[in-house]
Amino acid sequence: MDNHEEKRQRRVRYNGTHPKVFKEKYKELQPDKYADAVAKVIQKGSTPAGMHRSICVNEILEFLKITPGQTGLDATLGYGGHTLEMLKRLNSKGHLYAIDVDSIELPRTQERLEGLGYGSEILTIKQMNFSNIDQIALESGPLNFVLADLGVSSMQIDNPERGFSFKSEGPLDLRLNPNRGISAAARLKTISQDELQGMLLENADEPNSAAISRAIISEIKKGIDISTTTQLQQIIKDALKFIPQNTRKDEIKKSCQRCFQALRIDVNDEFEMLYEFLEKLPATLAEGGRVAILSFHSGEDRLVKKSFQRFFREGVYREIAPNFIRPSTEECNTNGRARSAKLRWAIKA
């Protein structure tokens, strides 16, 4: 053996499934380095950590019928997946406005899209809530197409520092814009048991709302500061010990998901913002303008459905979706987060 032979470089050691630093936990957070790992996650029907896979892309584009020269709005920029596909359809002619309330993810998405060659001549990005769609219309003029994807992005869910998931330790925040409003932890300190129970019922249809709200308020009255996601998860878990052992694990998981959803909707005023958006929407559309809305919650879908139906009866919309559209079976099999999606559309008279 040649003693002068260069020593073989060992690969960088992966820190395991439970590292001290969250960023080292998932190989998917480094897609360029671990492309095979990302591919395996997608193949299993999951979304890689820190990434977002846009839903119903083909169905949305088929309906919006975007052509070069048009002006449109992506009312929920997020990761920019839908945005990118709409920009491709415009083919450097026309203009796309894209807005999002998230002050953390927006600049990252903007940088990514600019890196792909989509500058201010074709794309205008603003940090704002879609309830202010009328302000966009003042600048853009009548819109030929509008898309709103009401789902929380995977980047938000997978980042424990945002506090959107009970699966990881993190601050109990849940705000889409961390610079505005109060966190979920602060909200719990101001709410009564009756209010909390009503919130869990209205925002998430939680069947165990009475037991869970009673347990949460009991802890707060003891002077316990519920400031982390795992604290809240444990309280919910303890409150549901009465559930039979054979179904308890699944029921606790579902209740945790619903409770976090209910709190997120509350601290971000999501239903109120959606209602305001839907009310202002028709006035921003050009004649024949098309709008597609993707929802993931029965309460959101009801608001969209009722708004579309009312404006259709009043002659504001000339046509609306007769029923919601579900993602294809193939998409649901390859992206589990698509399973609860519902797509509705309307066309301005």
UniProtKB/Swiss-Prot annotation:
**UniProt binding sites for S-adenosyl-L-methionine:** G80, G81, H82, D100, F130, D149, Q156
The reaction(s) this protein catalyses: cytidine(1402) in 16S rRNA + S-adenosyl-L-methionine = N(4)-methylcytidine(1402) in 16S rRNA + S-adenosyl-L-homocysteine + H(+)
Q: What GO biological process, any one, is recorded here?
A: rRNA base methylation
Reply yes or no: does the keyword S-adenosyl-L-methionine apply: yes
**Cellular component terms per the entry's GO annotation:** cytoplasm
What is the species of this protein? Alkaliphilus metalliredigens (strain QYMF)
The record's function comment reads: Specifically methylates the N4 position of cytidine in position 1402 (C1402) of 16S rRNA.
Source taxonomy: Bacteria, Bacillati, Bacillota, Clostridia, Peptostreptococcales
Q: Look up the signal peptide feature and give its range.
A: none
- Coarse class of the protein's main subcellular location: cytoplasm
Q: Which UniProt keywords apply?
A: Cytoplasm, Methyltransferase, rRNA processing, S-adenosyl-L-methionine, Transferase
Protein name per the record: Ribosomal RNA small subunit methyltransferase H 2
Which Gene Ontology MF annotations are present?
A: rRNA (cytosine-N4-)-methyltransferase activity
The kind of enzyme this is, by top-level EC class, is transferase
Pfam families per UniProt = Methyltransf_5 (PF01795)
